[in-house]
Amino acid sequence: MTYAESTRSAVVYSSIVPPPRTPVGPPMLKDGVRKGSASQPLQPKNGANSLDYWSKSEDEKSGITCYYSRHNIQFPPPQRKMKPVKPNPVGRSTINGFTPSTSSPQNGLRYPPFPQNTPESVMSPPVGIYRNIPAMPRAKLTKDEKNGGKMNRDGGGENPKNVVWGGTSRKDDDTASTPLNSFSANASIEKKRSTARRKPRWARCFQTLFCCVTPPREIEKIQSSQRTNSTNNNHQNGRPSTPTNTGPPIQLITQVHRDGTVTGLPTTGQACQQNGSGDGVTPYDKIANDSVGTINEKPLLPPLLPQDSNKKCLVIDLDETLVHSSFKPVKNPDFVIPVEIDGVEHQVYVLKRPYVDEFLAKVGEHFECILFTASLAKYADPVADLLDKKRVFRGRLFREACVFHKGNYVKDLSRLGRNLNQTLIIDNSPASYAFHPENAVPVTTWFDDPSDTELLDILPSLEHLNGFSSIYDLYRPEEGPQSELLNHCSC
């Protein structure tokens, strides 16, 4: 037996299969209440439970008798989930052989099912009777109810995108679906689970619109050049620029490793910018192309002191010649130098080469000693302070004084302001004295060998060279310097 529920139920439910049970009529009720249930009168107490309050309807085909009330008695809708049913074949009556009435409720009257307090196992599900709703399966929600529209009460119109008619989805068969019921909590939970958010397409539209005018790669180049120009302007105006991470801390020190590789060397473009040239020409290339008499470059060293006027100039390297430094902790370091790089403080562990103190004390008596290193001053200057306690070095030159030539830092002795025939260089890297190999006293690279005696072994050679008026007198004429540039003195 079928009863009408309410106006809202008529929109939600469309068809139902009647349960097999005996119809309940007025003779089976006592005072408007089903036998065996709680006392809840459905009609005024002063009125009798007569057929005047009920209307009777019979179906000849199915043999079902229906009783319905016309009184303004309102009951809350049943909180019961309904299972979807299969659609009725075309050509048959839409609701159990009855054609639903097209009349709308008057004076706000609602027609609830009867009886209300009947157990759920006995009650018939409500159906709508106010409109001619065609029989169809119930709609199911798939993913997101926001993308779809509401059901058309008349059954017409285009189906929403997220509503699936029937048992499975058209887009994704594996997507879980729930019945479209405005009174069930599953629909609200499904709304909360919706996480699909559409991104705005304005950026794509602008990119598509202006792609021919300025491609994305060109935009990145322009932004990069603007950042570089702003950084250069800050340096020129004396304002601190934003610190940038130029690489690992190992670039602070120029070192020769055990495998022969050299770290701390910049790229060719960076070296040209450091040397003030953007065309790839180094200062040495300019010196080599110019005549000797037209060079007016300022010397790197100050004039000779009176006590050093009769001494030869001895240029000494620092890393792997006198000391070995590492950013990794070592056992029993001689010095630990704190160095700040990009706002972060790093610890540099320094080991002194064996007999370095005796070596510096000996050469300081006979030579004008100059410290020349390809490392940065923020690291090399504190190391020199701890290493040279007797102030043997008359001057200190760092990476800024080197010339970057063919991928290496070269120490150009012609820029010192000393006579080349009175200048010697001690270095473990042949690339450092590539411009003046005849002035070099090579030494082996030292890392951590405690039995090394290289510094003591070269002392006799230095004393022997100091006895000549010119270091080139040691060579035969065919082995001497072949270029006027090597004999040039800029003092």
Swiss-Prot record:
It is an enzyme of class 3 (hydrolase). The keyword Magnesium applies. SMART domains: CPDc. It comes from the Eukaryota. One of its GO terms (biological process) is regulation of egg-laying behavior. Its EC number is 3.1.3.16. Residues 307-465 form the FCP1 homology domain. Signal peptide: none annotated. May also use Mn(2+). InterPro entries: Dullard_phosphatase, FCP1_dom, HAD-like_sf, HAD_sf, RNA_Pol_CTD_Phosphatase, TIM50. Residues 1-53, 140-198, 221-249, 261-282 are annotated as: Disordered. Keywords: Cytoplasm, Hydrolase, Magnesium, Metal-binding, Protein phosphatase. Gene3D superfamilies: HAD superfamily/HAD-like. GO terms for cellular component: I band; M band. Its cofactor is Mg(2+). Residues 223-237 have a biased composition (Low complexity). Residues 37-49, 176-187, 238-249, 264-276 have a biased composition (Polar residues). Residues 17-26 have a biased composition (Pro residues). It is found in: Cytoplasm, Myofibril, Sarcomere, M line. Inhibited by beryllium trifluoride (BeF(3-)) and tetrafluoroaluminate (AlF(4-)) but not by sodium fluoride (NaF) or sodium orthovanadate (Na3VO4). CDD domains: HAD_FCP1-like. The keyword Hydrolase applies. Phosphatase which may play a role in the egg laying muscles. May interact (via phosphatase domain) with cpna-1. Isoform a and isoform b may interact with lim-9 (via LIM zinc-binding domain). Isoform a and isoform b may interact (via FCP1 homology domain) with unc-89 (via fibronectin type-III domain 1, Ig-like C2-type domain 48/49 and protein kinase domain 1 or Ig-like C2-type domain 50, fibronectin type-III domain 2 and protein kinase domain 2); the interaction may act as a molecular bridge to bring two unc-89 molecules together or to stabilize a loop between the 2 protein kinase domains. NCBIfam families: HIF-SF_euk (TIGR02251). This is CTD small phosphatase-like protein 1. It comes from Caenorhabditis elegans.
